[in-house]
Amino acid sequence: WIMGHMVNAIAQIDEFVNLGANSIETDVSFDDSANPEYTYHGVPCDCGRTCTKWEYFNEFLKGLRKATTPGDSKYHEKLVLVVFDLKTSSLYDNQASDAGKKLAKSLLQNYWNNGNNGGRAYIVLSIPNLAHYKLITGFKETLTSEGHPELMDKVGYDFSGNDEIGDVAKTYKKAGVTGHVWQSDGITNCLLRGLDRVRKAVANRDSSNGYINKVYYWTVDKRATTRDALDAGVDGIMTNYPDVIADVLNESAYKAKFRIASYDDNPWETFKN
């Protein structure tokens, strides 16, 4: 999965997919009442990027729905996965469940079109704080109570705080999550970060009793770092330059071992090295 980083304006969906992304990451900010409000990152952000592009969250979802609904004039067949980077640090811990409920309602209405031929992309809810695990339970409860538990088949999870892998596993237990787990590791492109924790995450994925299904590394903009991440066995790379990742995947060393995921590739299925 080539994951376009910080895609927060509807116009950027086309831009990143046309550069080679089959997945995008979108920032979601919340208001004081835990309603998802904007797709917005703000300052500071990655070096070389504009930090302030934004849409109203529900409007972004409508644009995203068009981009992922077969037959729509804006449809991109290869856009198959969306990571919502949920900026919950603005909330109190006890608002996490509400944030999940409100997020589910927004997605149900504006992305899934109330279960009636909505967008088809798989969705990863990426949460920065382990203490906010009730966002997951609130989300699940709402889809169930609204009569669409089947949409949970399209939803996966990530805790993005670079926490100890054992602590993440315990948190998923509390949230009742037993699959659909992506594990991120990374840092802003302005700084360097080694691959130690990525290797631990890959080892967990490849073990017989691990909780991780997929591992992705962020934010990678250079060819050398891309090669290092691929050598470590990641499933996804988040980038500001999808074309760079696509170029490296075309190199003879990687062409035989990796391919770009399509809609038929289940993002919740573990593919071991």
Swiss-Prot record:
Mg(2+) binds at residues 25, 27, 85. Disulfide bonds join 45-51, 47-190. Belongs to the arthropod phospholipase D family. Class II subfamily. Its cofactor is Mg(2+). Its EC number is 4.6.1.-. This is Dermonecrotic toxin LdSicTox-alphaIB1aii. One of its GO terms (biological process) is killing of cells of another organism. Keywords: Cytolysis, Dermonecrotic toxin, Disulfide bond, Glycoprotein, Hemolysis, Lipid degradation, Lipid metabolism, Lyase, Magnesium, Metal-binding, Secreted, Toxin. Expressed by the venom gland. Its main location: secreted. One of its GO terms (cellular component) is extracellular region. The active site is at residues 5, 41. Glycans are attached at residue 250. SUPFAM superfamilies: PLC-like phosphodiesterases. GO terms for molecular function: lyase activity; metal ion binding; phosphoric diester hydrolase activity; toxin activity. InterPro entries: PLC-like_Pdiesterase_TIM-brl. Dermonecrotic toxins cleave the phosphodiester linkage between the phosphate and headgroup of certain phospholipids (sphingolipid and lysolipid substrates), forming an alcohol (often choline) and a cyclic phosphate. This toxin acts on sphingomyelin (SM). It may also act on ceramide phosphoethanolamine (CPE), lysophosphatidylcholine (LPC) and lysophosphatidylethanolamine (LPE), but not on lysophosphatidylserine (LPS), and lysophosphatidylglycerol (LPG). It acts by transphosphatidylation, releasing exclusively cyclic phosphate products as second products. The lineage of its organism: Eukaryota, Metazoa, Ecdysozoa, Arthropoda, Chelicerata. Binds 1 Mg(2+) ion per subunit. The keyword Magnesium applies. It catalyses: an N-(acyl)-sphingosylphosphocholine = an N-(acyl)-sphingosyl-1,3-cyclic phosphate + choline; an N-(acyl)-sphingosylphosphoethanolamine = an N-(acyl)-sphingosyl-1,3-cyclic phosphate + ethanolamine; a 1-acyl-sn-glycero-3-phosphocholine = a 1-acyl-sn-glycero-2,3-cyclic phosphate + choline; a 1-acyl-sn-glycero-3-phosphoethanolamine = a 1-acyl-sn-glycero-2,3-cyclic phosphate + ethanolamine. It is found in: Secreted.
